[in-house]
Swiss-Prot record:
Changing C567S: Strongly reduced palmitoylation and localization to the cell membrane. This is Nucleotide-binding oligomerization domain-containing protein 1. A lipid is attached at C558, C567, C952 (S-palmitoyl cysteine). Highly expressed in adult heart, skeletal muscle, pancreas, spleen and ovary. Also detected in placenta, lung, liver, kidney, thymus, testis, small intestine and colon. The LRR repeats recognize and bind gamma-D-glutamyl-meso-diaminopimelic acid (iE-DAP). Changing V41A: Abolishes interaction with RIPK2/RICK. SMART domains: LRR_RI. Changing R69E: Abolishes activation of NF-kappa-B. Abolished interaction with ubiquitin and RIPK2. Keywords: Apoptosis, ATP-binding, Cell membrane, Cytoplasm, Immunity, Innate immunity, Leucine-rich repeat, Lipoprotein, Membrane, Nucleotide-binding, Palmitate, Repeat, Ubl conjugation. Changing H517A: Loss of activation by sphingosine-1-phosphate.
Length: 953
């Protein structure tokens, strides 16, 4: 065998030579690669192998290589035990002596039990910094930020995962994520291998910041096993605090503005540059940057020592120009776009499902009786349930429930009427204003909401002033001077609505503040616009300027350009919908509509002069009506068969939300009249279950029958319940990709069978099981005009398949059934075969990807010999073989109606293909037989090049 050498010098195995000899023979290798001598000296002293005098001798050496040589001399002079311990140190302190890992593995060093019993103290700067970061993040992530500062809620006690979905570049679903650890998994959901950034998006309040806080906690406590040694967490809004002229190098950004190493920062930074893959960065809230930052057009800065503006450093970290290989997690609200070349994967947070909500109730209220009371009240009020699908709003409502329990002697009662988001925020404001009052052991606080808000008017005005000043500039962090200028007192700060930041501002010498959540800042901004009678019409309506037709909205921007990057605005094409990235304005408009609604006048007339209130209400309603009319007229329209279809944008969802906050039937009627179409398409609008309340509020005024397409949103079962007022008008209902379970299908069954007018029902890619399939069967049986049924990619097995097939068999109207991606198997296929036999109307059937094998396939083929209606049959991705191909060939000799037969990705060979091709000689009706992905070799497929109806590749 050829002898293998070492790059430095020949290695003498330790098992055949004393440890002293091993050190002597590899002396220059050790001198070259040992850079940290202090850690060695510390441990040799700790275990009494070195004396103080030995340590002084080492320290007196002028250069690092000299120190290493002196240590080696001293160690070897002290004998075999010390030499073995020296090697043990190199093995145990892996970060400090990372370059020696291959050598230690190659020599097969294995310490004795005596050596392993010795204490090793890790004073290596890199390891110390890792521990320092763990302590820092552990402290910051232990408690959840809470409204009331005197309360501290443990993250471990209240955190709960939400629905996490992997999505593609266009937000199409790629499947669910089951745990936070999967976020950093390098094998699932990868969109771009070259991308550096994992992008987490979701609506305000859906839990993006909490998710990052949970990740911090897991890493700090050693429960996130992802090979991460450095964890840097930044909130993007803090980058807005830097001045235009500020310049930092990467080391200063990480150390001076996050966590400074206790020892040898240069060595720590050098390790980070050399091994960037051991670092994890999280950047929370890209949408909260006070800049029209176009990440794809920021100047490159690939040198870690070159000073640059912090925003340039941020952009280059995300792109991988700086610290390429480090993991980066970036969060933003839905609507923010990040250049595709930056993205490694995208994750969409969808909030709480009904099962999440029940689990969260158990977490927040351990007492079973209390859980049952809360859940029964929520079930009785689907409007509240819908609000609770957003974790932040759920938490607020649950906190109010706790308050009612304490305030009303253990008999908590949530409101049983319709609640808007404005109601929720008014409620939490009232709760916390009351909690600041002195408590009495003998008398409950019985102040009315009017009295509570009147007593806290000055505090509300001061909070509103701070919020409004920030909102005008899209700023979310405030200096101490700005807070003091508003007149806020120390007792006001105890409410917890405005809180001190854990980190100091960029100057490092003054405290900064922020609102508990962006939605809270929007609420107090709206409150300020209502309370301050000096606010004129233009200022009142400022944030509505985005309610313009898409073509007009793209011409201006509320954001001042970020001066260092004039190219960020550029002269390129205008944005399609500038408003989509500015939810903080949208929430302000929403709360303004709620506060100025007729229902809130009794509450506000003691806070605002009557004349000012009338003036503001009049101005708001006039603007709301005209904006709504103009926007609806501008929406793109298209004629689809007998429908006049209008394609609405996400801005329309915000308009509906604002209309719902008014609770004005007049406004709802106006909106319904303005739609001027009988097919409303709201796909990919990121609508949640609470939005169904707003949609129903408008659509129940629609005078005619309507087609409604809500595919690819986030409605879940609560959203289906909220749509109940609309069902009497809906002929087309598309709810695919919406997290709907059997409970939601039950509601559909009950409601749609009341009116029996539905012709199209789309429920593709939900969470429907055999139980839900039976509810769909009822719809098929009783809705005699139903022509299209889409149930693909659910969880329906042969049992549910049999029920559905029987209903299809009995239907005289059904023309298209989609069952792709279920698991009906051979038994289900046989049932559908019976349905096909002599069916009068079914033209399209998809049983693709259903686990169908020989028996099921042959049954379908035999049935089609007695069918003259079916034109399209999809059997892609099953387990069909040549036996099935033979049966299908026999069928084709008889059936002249079938036009498209898809057998892609099955187990058919050249033999089965030949039989199908022969059958075409006597069939003039079929236009294609697709056999791509079967067991057919390219040379075998060449035989059929002239037969264009056989498609093999």
């Amino acid at each position: 065998m050829e002898e293998q050498g070492h790059s430095e010098m020949e290695i003498i195995p330790s098992e055949s030579h004393p440890h002293i000899q091993l050190l002597k023979s590899n002396r220059e290798l050790l001198v070259t690669h040992i850079r940290n001598t202090q850690c060695l000296v510390d441990n040799l002293l700790k275990n009494d192998y070195f004396s103080a005098e030995d340590a002084e001798i080492v320290c007196a050496c002028p250069t690092q290589p000299d120190k290493v040589r002196k240590i080696l001399d001293l160690v070897q002079s002290k004998g075999e035990e010390v030499s073995e311990f020296f090697l043990y140190l190199l093995q145990q302190l892996a970060d400090a002596y990372v370059d020696l890992r291959p050598w230690l593995l190659e020599i097969g060093f294995s310490p004795s039990l005596l050596t392993q019993s010795k204490v090793v103290v890790n004073t290596d700067p890199v390891s110390r910094y890792t521990q320092q970061l763990r302590h820092h993040l552990g402290r910051d992530s232990k408690f959840v930020l809470c409204y009331a500062q005197k309360e501290e809620l443990l993250l471990e006690e209240i955190y709960m995962d939400t629905i996490m979905e992997l999505v593609g570049f266009s937000n199409e679903s790629l499947g669910s994520l089951n745990s936070l650890a999967c976020l950093l998994d390098h094998t699932t959901g990868i969109l771009n291998e070259q991308g550096e950034t994992i992008f987490i998006l979701g609506d305000a309040g859906v839990g993006k910041s909490m998710l990052l806080q949970r990740l911090q906690s897991l890493w700090a406590t050693g429960r996130l096993d992802a090979g991460v040694k450095f964890f840097f967490h930044f909130r993007c809004r803090m980058f807005s605090c830097f001045k235009e002229s500020d310049r930092l190098c990467l080391q200063d950004l990480l150390f001076k503005h996050y966590c400074y190493p206790e020892r040898d920062p240069e060595e720590v930074f050098a390790f980070l540059l050399r091994f960037p893959h051991v670092a994890l960065f999280t950047f929370d809230g890209l949408d909260e940057l006070h800049s029209d930052l176009d990440l794809s057009r920021v100047p490159d800065s690939s040198c870690p020592w070159e000073p640059a503006h912090p925003l340039v450093l941020l952009a280059n970290l995300l792109s991988g120009k700086l610290l390429k290989g480090a993991s980066k997690l970036l969060t933003a609200r839905t609507g923010i776009e990040v250049p595709r070349q930056f993205l490694r994967k995208k994750v969409l947070l969808r909030g709480f499902s009904p099962s999440h909500l029940r689990a969260y109730a158990r977490r927040m209220f351990p007492e079973r009786a209390l859980q049952d009371r809360l859940l029964s009240q929520l079930e009785a009020n689907p409007n509240l349930c819908s609000l609770c699908s957003v974790p932040l709003f759920c938490w607020i409502i649950f906190r109010c429930f706790q308050h009612f329990r304490a305030a009303f002697e253990g008999s908590p009662q949530l409101p049983d009427c319709t609640m808007t988001l404005t109601d929720v925020f008014l409620l939490v404001t009232e709760v916390h204003l009351n909690r600041m009052q002195p408590s009495s052991l003998v008398q409950r606080n019985t102040r009315s909401p009017v009295e509570t808000l009147h007593a806290g008017r000055d505090t509300l005005c001061s909070l509103g002033q701070v919020a409004h000043r920030g909102m005008e500039k899209s700023l979310f962090v405030f200096t101490q001077e700005e807070v003091q200028a508003s007149g806020l007192q120390e007792r006001d700060m105890q409410l917890g609505f405005l809180r001190a930041l854990p980190e100091l501002g960029p100057g490092g010498d003054q405290q900064s503040y922020e609102f508990f959540h962006l939605t809270l800042q929007a609420f107090f901004t709206a409150f300020f616009l209502v309370l301050d009678d000096r606010v004129g019409t233009q200022e009142l309506l400022r944030f509505f300027q985005e309610w313009m037709p898409p073509a007009g909205a793209a011409t201006t921007s509320c954001y001042p350009p970020f001066l260092p990057f004039q190219c960020l605005q550029g002269s390129g094409p205008a944005r399609e919908d500038l408003f989509k990235n500015k939810d903080h304005f949208q929430f302000t408009n929403l709360f303004l509509c709620g506060l100025l609604s007729k229902a809130k006048q009794k509450l506000l007339r003691h806070l605002v002069p009557a004349a000012a209130l009338r003036r503001k209400r009049k101005a708001l309603w006039a603007h709301l009506f005209s904006s709504l009319r103009g926007y609806l007229k501008s929406l793109p329209r298209v004629q689809v068969e007998s429908f006049n279809q209008v394609q609405a944008m996400p801005t329309f969802i915000w308009m509906l939300r604002c209309i719902y906050e008014t609770q004005s039937q007049k406004v709802g009627q106006l909106a319904a009249r303005g739609i001027c179409a009988n097919y409303l398409k709201l796909t990919y609008c990121n609508a949640c279950s609470a939005d169904c309340s707003a949609l129903s509020f408008v659509l129940h005024h629609f005078p005619k029958r309507l087609a409604l397409d809500l595919d690819n949103n986030n409605l879940n079962d609560y959203g289906v319940r909220e749509l109940q007022p609309c069902f009497s008008r809906l002929t087309v209902l598309r709810l695919s990709v919406n997290q709907i379970t059997d409970g939601g299908v039950k509601v559909l069954s009950e409601e749609l069978t009341k009116y029996k007018i539905v012709t199209y029902l789309g429920l593709y890619n939900n969470q429907i099981t055999d139980v839900g399939a039976r509810y769909v069967t009822k719809i098929l049986d009783e809705c005699k005009g139903l022509t299209h049924l889409k149930l693909g990619k659910n969880k329906i097995t042969s049992e549910g398949g049999k029920y559905l097939a029987l209903a299809v068999k009995n239907s005289k109207s059904i023309s298209e059934v989609g069952m792709w991606g279920n698991q009906v198997g051979d038994e289900g296929a046989k049932a559908f075969a019976e349905a096909l036999r002599n069916h009068p109307s079914l033209t399209t059937l998809s049983l693709a990807s259903n686990g169908i094998s020989t028996e099921g396939g042959k049954s379908l083929a035999r049935a089609l010999q007695q069918n003259t209606s079916l034109e399209i049959l999809w059997l892609t991705q099953n387990e069909l073989n040549d036996e099935v191909a033979e049966s299908l060939a026999e069928m084709l000799k008889v059936n002249q109606t079938l036009k498209h037969l898809w057998l892609i990705q099955n187990q058919i060979t050249a033999k089965g293909t030949a039989q199908l091709a022969d059958a075409l000689q006597s069939n003039t009706g079929i236009t294609e037989i697709c056999l791509n992905g079967n067991l057919i070799k390219p040379e075998e497929a060449k035989v059929y090049e002239d037969e264009k109806r056989i498609i093999c590749f």
